Design a protein with these regions (language model features):
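N-terminal membrane-anchoring alpha-helices
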Residues: 1-60
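Mobile, glycine- and charge-enriched loop segments
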Residues: 45-78, 215-216, 221-224
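Beta-strand-turn-beta hairpins that frame and shape the catalytic cleft
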Residues: 56-67, 169-170, 176-188, 218-222, ...
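Membrane-embedded segments
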Residues: 62-170
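Active-site neighborhood of phospho(di)ester-bond hydrolases with catalytic His/Asp-centered motifs
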Residues: 68-70, 95-101, 127-134, 172-175, ...
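Solvent-exposed loop/turn segments at secondary-structure junctions
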Residues: 73-74, 102-105, 134-138, 177-179, ...
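Binuclear metal-dependent hydrolase catalytic cores centered on His/Asp/Glu-rich metal-binding motifs
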Residues: 143-169, 181-223, 233-234, 239, ...
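Conserved beta-sheet core of the metallophosphoesterase superfamily
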Residues: 230-309
Length: 316
């Protein structure tokens, strides 16, 4: 018969093994459950979800509704994007902003025609304004000026630009219009490059952008800006320099792969980025970032359903 002390030691070791085994089973089960949930989340990728935000402003009375659609990258949701058009119609917007990367520079003639067809159907719902992104800039413009790796200005309209404008849309880049939305007077602009002086800027390249932004901001009207990359406005001194009521952006795809309740794992901003999706107040700016519709090349969206964004601008 074993001594009592030795018996108790064996008993404690048995308890330890049981605890470790239970912990291992729990860990493996959790990992398998997480993987299964991630695979299940891939089924969301053929649907379009609508996300809603509200913004109060003392510059409006009756208010208006903005629909933001970004980063389609030639994808189709239903034949001829019928699902996307249906979601846009259900949103009942007063204005539709296409926030860039809706198409690709390398798109075929047939893909260009499909995009023009989509624009025509969206124009039937509400006025459509198009901002450019890094993937479709040369679908709408034939040349650009650069500093290092940054595109700073664009020119030379293409056949696609002419086609979408004939369809009733307006392409805005480094330009703005004073328009009326649901009875509210609004200054609407489009601006892709950085709204701050970058280290690669020359005096000339920055001065051109600075003058445009000063002209754009010189109004008492509600200011709405389509800017594909939110980083163009939230970095450096841009939030303190430019008083813009609402900047609408995309570009991030919410990092493509996200974690439930946390958000994007990584995006160009870094790990667990702040500005990958949602509504933010930075300095004098309000920024809404749409997670967009497509994945990233061969990488599917995980825990990151494709979305369009509705922003209700209401009286304060």
């Amino acid at each position: 018969m074993f001594p009592p002390v030795l018996f108790k030691k064996v008993k404690r070791n048995n308890k330890k093994r049981v605890v470790l085994r239970a912990a291992a089973i729990l860990l493996i089960g959790s990992v398998l459950g997480f993987i299964a949930a991630g695979l299940w989340s891939l089924t969301w990728n053929d649907r379009v979800f609508t996300v809603r935000y509200e913004l109060a402003s003392d510059k409006v009375d009756s208010g208006f509704r903005v629909l933001l659609i970004t980063d389609l990258h030639l994808r189709e949701f239903g034949e001829g994007n019928s699902m996307l058009v249906a979601r846009a119609r259900d949103a009942a917007p007063d204005i539709i902003c296409l926030g860039g990367d809706m198409i690709e520079t390398y798109a075929s003639y047939e893909q260009d025609e499909a995009f023009v067809s989509l624009v025509k159907r969206l124009v039937e719902i509400a006025p459509v304004y198009i901002g450019i992104g890094n993937h479709d800039a040369f679908a709408f413009y034939s040349w650009c000026a650069r500093t290092d790796m940054e595109m700073t200005s664009f020119g030379g309209v293409t056949n696609l630009t002419r086609a979408v404008e004939e369809a009733g849309a307006v392409v805005l880049e480094k330009g703005f219009e004073d328009i009326e939305i649901n009875g509210e007077k609004v200054r609407l602009g489009g601006f892709y490059p950085f709204a701050f002086r970058d280290e690669g800027d020359t005096d000339e390249s920055w001065e051109s952008r600075r003058v445009f932004l000063e002209d754009y901001c010189d109004t008492e009207l509600f200011k709405l800006m389509i800017s594909h990359r939110a980083v163009s406005f939230y970095r450096e001194d841009a939030p303190d320099n430019w008083d813009i009521d609402l900047v609408v952006s995309g570009h991030t795809h919410n990092g493509v792969v996200a974690l439930p309740g946390i958000g994007a794992i990584w995006e160009n901003e870094g790990f667990f980025p702040k500005h990958s999706r949602g509504m933010f107040h930075e300095g004098k700016l309000n920024i809404v970032v749409c997670a967009g519709l497509d994945g990233h090349g061969c990488i599917p969206r995980v825990f990151n359903p494709p979305e369009i964004v509705v922003i209700d601008v209401k009286a304060k």
